[in-house]
Curated annotation (Swiss-Prot):
The gene is ERVFRD-1. It comes from Pongo pygmaeus. The chain crosses the membrane at residues 479-499. Residues 1-15 form the signal peptide. This is Syncytin-2. GO terms for biological process: syncytium formation; syncytium formation by plasma membrane fusion. A motif (CXXC) lies at residues 43-46.
């Protein structure tokens, strides 16, 4: 009985064991349990080993277009015709920087994160930019877009100041104009388009006061009770539920649509003659890129996935999530034991019917056709996509440190060369005087090595655990999930072997005692039967 109690105590602990080495599988298991899927128990979770298709992209819902937050990154360039006006222009630039507390001035890392990604379902909203000499990020086909907004490719916004007092609070014009298919937008008189985030600075140019007559309803994405609205003065989207209060109009500081359109703009500042001469003088212009601040959300452009869109980008993009290729196999089928890279044991190949994870969750990728019934789908995409974003952030930190190292190297080279060349000017410069190569020490190289060493150690640790297989202690815990279904029959057989002889002996003695009792009763009955005894006459 003690062994039986021990098994009953340990069984829940073994069943609740997680896989810390595979966070995506753990997240998938939690999602299956939280959604009440029939595959939440007694199933296999398998990952794809293909490197050609790292995952699948799913579009965000119309409501998420109003809630996902973006951020802007600003860089500026002096006008090449600016001569002798650096001091007043620099003063104006410092004023402009103070006017944008929500803009980050450190440039992000651009480029696609994944390629060969397939978009599942119809994207509710797509944005198309066709700038000349722009950076192509990828193009989605029109067949996968429900509503497509096209940014005006010929618009150039250049702000001119005619009075000195305006320089203390410079303003940019409204975001670029966008066009849309005829019949897509309907005029709606509602105050939801006049809302603005209370936690953000209202001085930024994308928070210009809304025009009450420019609030348009996107008919393809709206229903009777729920509307998706577009404010054309700020390129902002709003989601309105007619049964709830007006506090729904609180939106992120920078909306996705506003950030995508601003990143295609050519923004500049010029001043008139009373400050800098007799004619209109351009001072500087800005390059603004945009990134998604909400973790787990990505720009989906064709088959490429981006975290940031560069300034002057071109292509057709939407926003969404990236989920890894995880498949489900029912637990009533036999699978080959996972080898995890152990080449000493043979691999078993057989045809197995796998079910995609999102199909097992009961989710249909139909977010592009409406705004109702998609909460569970959006939450699932976001949670799975966040695990990928965490890995990307780790690699981005290492790349950022490398970028800082290059900047530091350039600064040291320029500073030392200037100083040494001045001291050795008579000899033609330091390198010519020494007649050898000049070497420099970069003080941030240790950070790069530490980051790379940590990444290599993590990869090495995972590789060691994978090659050891079931021979190590951690691998033994993983094997419990395979042995657990056989625990019940094995325990029953063990109990039968332990207590079977005793039970058999008790049953045998009981049967023998009953047989003896019956035999004794039969003999007594036969000996006590009455007989007809006649008395003798004698």
């Amino acid at each position: 009985m003690g062994l039986l109690l021990l098994v009953l105590i340990l069984t829940p602990l073994l069943a609740a064991h997680r896989h810390p080495d595979f966070p995506l599988l753990e997240k998938a298991q939690q999602l299956l349990q939280s959604t009440g899927s029939p595959y939440s128990t007694n199933c296999w979770l398998c990952t794809s080993s293909s490197t050609e298709t790292p995952g699948t992209a799913y579009p965000a819902s119309p409501r998420e277009w109003t809630s996902i937050e973006a951020e802007l990154h600003i860089s500026y360039h002096w006008d090449p015709n600016l001569k002798g006006l650096m001091r007043p222009a620099n003063s104006l630039l410092s004023t402009v920087k103070q006017d944008f507390p929500d803009i980050r001035q450190k440039p992000p890392i651009f480029g696609p994160i994944f390629t060969n990604i397939n978009l599942m379902g119809i994207a509710p909203i797509c944005v198309t930019a066709k700038r000349k000499n722009g950076t192509n990020v990828g193009t989605l086909p029109s067949t996968v877009c429900n509503v497509t907004f096209t940014v005006d490719p010929n618009q150039q916004t250049y702000q001119t100041y005619t009075h000195k007092q305006f320089l203390h609070q410079p303003r940019f014009p409204k975001p670029p104009n966008i066009t849309f298919p005829q019949g897509t937008l309907l005029d709606k008189s509602t105050r939801f388009c006049q809302g603005r985030p209370s936690s953000c600075s209202t001085r930024n140019f994308w928070f210009r006061p809304a025009d009450y007559n420019q609030c348009l309803q996107i008919s393809n994405l709206s229903s009777t009770a729920e509307w998706v609205l577009l404010d054309q003065t700020r390129n902002s989207l709003f989601w309105e539920n007619k049964t709830k209060g007006a506090n729904q109009s609180q939106t992120p500081c920078v909306q996705v649509l506003a950030g995508m359109t601003i990143a295609t703009s050519y923004l500049g500042i010029s001043a008139v003659s009373e400050f800098f001469g007799t004619s209109l003088t351009p001072l500087f212009h800005f390059h603004i890129s945009t990134c998604l601040k909400t973790q787990g959300a990505f720009y989906i452009c064709g088959q490429s996935i981006h975290q940031c869109l560069p300034s002057n980008w071109t292509g057709t993009c939407t926003i969404g999530y990236v989920t890894p290729d995880i498949f489900i196999a029912p637990g009533n089928i036999s699978l080959p034991i996972p080898i995890y890279g152990n080449s000493q044991l043979p691999r078993v190949r057989r045809a197995i019917h796998f079910i995609p994870l999102l199909a097992g969750l009961g989710i249909i990728a139909g977010t592009g056709t409406g705004i109702a019934g998609i909460t569970k789908a959006s939450l699932t995409y976001s949670q799975l996509s966040k695990e990928i974003a965490k890995n990307i952030d780790t690699m981005a930190k290492a790349l950022t440190t490398v970028q800082e190292q290059i900047d530091s190297l350039a600064a040291v080279v320029l500073q030392n060369r200037r100083g040494l060349d001045m001291l050795t000017a008579a000899q033609g410069g330091i390198c010519l005087a020494l007649d050898e190569k000049c070497c420099f020490w970069v003080n941030q190289s240790g950070k790069v090595q530490d980051n790379i060493r940590q990444l290599l150690n993590q990869a090495s640790s995972l590789r060691e655990r994978a090659t050891q297989g079931w021979l190590n202690w951690e691998g033994t815990w993983k094997w419990f999930s395979w042995v657990l279904p056989f625990t019940g029959p094995l325990v029953s057989l063990l109990l039968l072997l332990l207590f079977g002889p005793c039970l058999l002996n008790l049953i045998t003695q009981f049967v023998l005692s009953r047989l003896q009792a019956i035999k004794l009763q039969t003999n007594l009955s036969a000996g006590c039967r009455p007989h007809n005894i006649q008395e003798s006459p004698f």
